[in-house]
Amino acid sequence: MAAKIRQNDEVIVLAGKDKGKRGKVTKVLPNGKVVVEGINIITKHEKPVPALGKAGGLVKKEAAIDASNVAIFNPETNKADRVGFRFEDGKKVRFFKSNEKTI
């Protein structure tokens, strides 16, 4: 099945502590989660690894968020939108449901 949200899509968060924030999808995970730039920041405590020259400490990084909690952002309407699929010239393409524009 084709993915409705793909890497480099601009999305808006629908639920959770970052509700209403926008960001670019940096990674799509196979378990139905996405990593969004600047969203769902966690603080991870890392141990130092002298053999690799890694310093320990607190590291802030982006955690995965469920794909159902984000929606693709439509720049023309400035709102979250739904995604549909159709065939154009024998290729399957995604389009915004609100204004039928190809993504």
UniProtKB/Swiss-Prot annotation:
Family from the record: Belongs to the universal ribosomal protein uL24 family.
UniProt name for this protein: Large ribosomal subunit protein uL24
GO cellular component terms given for this protein: ribonucleoprotein complex; ribosome
Molecular-function GO terms, alphabetical: rRNA binding; structural constituent of ribosome
Keyword rRNA-binding in record: yes
Subunit structure: Part of the 50S ribosomal subunit.
Gene3D superfamilies according to UniProt: 2.30.30.30
Keywords, comma-separated and alphabetical: Ribonucleoprotein, Ribosomal protein, RNA-binding, rRNA-binding
